[in-house]
């Protein structure tokens, strides 16, 4: 058999020097340490849950799901986002430390899906609330597509310059004309109107009750006679 020789490592220079930049070092350290905050509201999230199994094994990408937004640098939105849940989603995003990323997963998250045509309570795109880095279309997207989206996000992180990212972010994000919140006066004050609970009987009810008693008295008088 032919012997295979591997090149020997150069061990003659113990004082080796690695030349890099702070941006490259930071990007390299964040490539395999993305900690996602899972924000699943619909059936698309079931496809992401399949990545936890041994077939796809998302641990090889360094993904460690976190339950606190203060410990996460990636939020993955999957499913329909309603107007009532929109402030909570924005609050979770604001609590995440910089740099932070967003993956919009599924048609309902990206455009509102089938609920966006005639629903008054559906946000027509999560990018109206928070900036999105990677769009992942599908209804629902397959686990292979999710892995591809994570790979694309890692490539984006590897070529990223931190100062450019901060400058490119939109500071004042607002809703569209159809998605404006209006502060209304609460109708649940805790004080109940006694007049609504105990209403006085109307005149017609009194007359009908009196007539019924009069007829019953006549019938009993006839039976006695």
UniProtKB/Swiss-Prot annotation:
UniProt key word Hydrolase: no
Cofactor details (free text): Binds 1 [4Fe-4S] cluster.
InterPro entries registered for this protein in UniProt: NADH_UbQ_OxRdtase-like_20kDa, NADH_UQ_OxRdtase_20Kd_su
Main EC class the enzyme belongs to: translocase
Keyword set, alphabetical order: 4Fe-4S, Chloroplast, Iron, Iron-sulfur, Membrane, Metal-binding, NAD, NADP, Plastid, Plastoquinone, Quinone, Thylakoid, Translocase, Transport
Reactions catalysed, as given in the entry: a plastoquinone + NADH + (n+1) H(+)(in) = a plastoquinol + NAD(+) + n H(+)(out); a plastoquinone + NADPH + (n+1) H(+)(in) = a plastoquinol + NADP(+) + n H(+)(out)
Principal localisation: plastid
Pfam families attached to this UniProt entry: Oxidored_q6 (PF01058)
GO biological process assignments: aerobic respiration; electron transport coupled proton transport; photosynthesis, light reaction
Cofactor(s) recorded in Swiss-Prot or TrEMBL: [4Fe-4S] cluster
GO MF, one annotated term: iron ion binding
EC id: 7.1.1.-
Covalent S-S links between cysteines: none
Positions contributing to [4Fe-4S] cluster binding: 43-44, 108, 139
PROSITE patterns noted in UniProt: COMPLEX1_20K (PS01150)
A single cellular component GO annotation: chloroplast thylakoid membrane
Role: NDH shuttles electrons from NAD(P)H:plastoquinone, via FMN and iron-sulfur (Fe-S) centers, to quinones in the photosynthetic chain and possibly in a chloroplast respiratory chain. The immediate electron acceptor for the enzyme in this species is believed to be plastoquinone. Couples the redox reaction to proton translocation, and thus conserves the redox energy in a proton gradient.
NCBIfam families: nuoB_fam, PRK06411.1
Family of this protein: Belongs to the complex I 20 kDa subunit family.
Assembly notes: NDH is composed of at least 16 different subunits, 5 of which are encoded in the nucleus.
Protein name (record): NAD(P)H-quinone oxidoreductase subunit K, chloroplastic
Species of origin: Amborella trichopoda
Gene for this chain: ndhK
């Amino acid at each position: 058999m032919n012997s295979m020789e591997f090149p020997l490592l150069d061990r003659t220079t113990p004082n080796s020097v690695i030349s890099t930049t702070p941006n490259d070092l930071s990007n390299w350290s964040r490539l395999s340490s993305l900690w996602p905050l899972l924000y699943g509201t619909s059936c698309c999230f079931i496809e992401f849950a399949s990545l936890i199994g041994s077939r796809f094994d998302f641990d090889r990408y360094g993904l460690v799901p976190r339950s606190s937004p203060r410990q996460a640098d990636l939020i993955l939105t999957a499913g329909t986002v309603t107007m009532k849940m929109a402030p909570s989603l924005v609050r979770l995003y604001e609590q995440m430390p910089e740099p932070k990323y967003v993956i919009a997963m599924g048609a309902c998250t990206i455009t509102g899906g089938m609920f966006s045509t005639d629903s008054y309570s559906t946000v027509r795109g999560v990018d109206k609330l928070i900036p999105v880095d990677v769009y992942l279309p599908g209804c629902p997207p397959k686990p292979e597509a999710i892995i591809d989206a994570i790979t694309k996000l890692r490539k984006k992180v590897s070529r990223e310059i931190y100062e450019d990212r901060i400058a490119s972010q939109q500071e004042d994000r607002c809703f569209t004309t159809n998605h404006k919140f209006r502060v209304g006066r609460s109708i649940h004050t805790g004080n109940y109107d006694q007049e609504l609970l105990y209403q006085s009987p109307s005149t017609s009810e009194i007359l009908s009750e009196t007539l019924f008693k009069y007829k019953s008295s006549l019938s009993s008088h006839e039976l006695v006679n």
